Amino acid sequence: MDSAKVKISNKTISSINSGLLIFIGIYFNDTSDDINKLYNKIINLRIFEENNKFSIRDIAGEILLVSQFTLCANTKKGNRPSFKDAMEPEKAEIIFNTIVDKFKESKLKIQTGQFGAFMDVSLKNKGPMTIMLDTKI
């Protein structure tokens, strides 16, 4: 990813250059174990440069974390998504902040969106490469 930014009410609140834009959907049954699995996978995932030789740490990349409950949508029945599998907002915000704190331990540049806000998120994707990580499978 070449760059990403988050705007709220047409004002940029965070932006990064080369690195990862990570959308996080928090499910009702996510735990601290899921946080650790997610963190370890992302920090060590070798997806950068030729032949995918380097991790985000290796390239001293930047990370933009954005909470997105719509990733928890269930579309199996009907034509309207159900979000019943998403964690309730008050608890999800605590989990999201814990995830942010965990990533800050990496000493990489970490930026975030604003939890619960209506955001304009833009991305200049390279490849494109988009990977979905699920700590339950």
Q: Language model features by range: what are they?
A:
Residues 78-85:
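Short hinge/gating elements
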Residues 1-78, 90-137:
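N-terminal, polar/charged subdomain of small-to-medium soluble alpha/beta proteins
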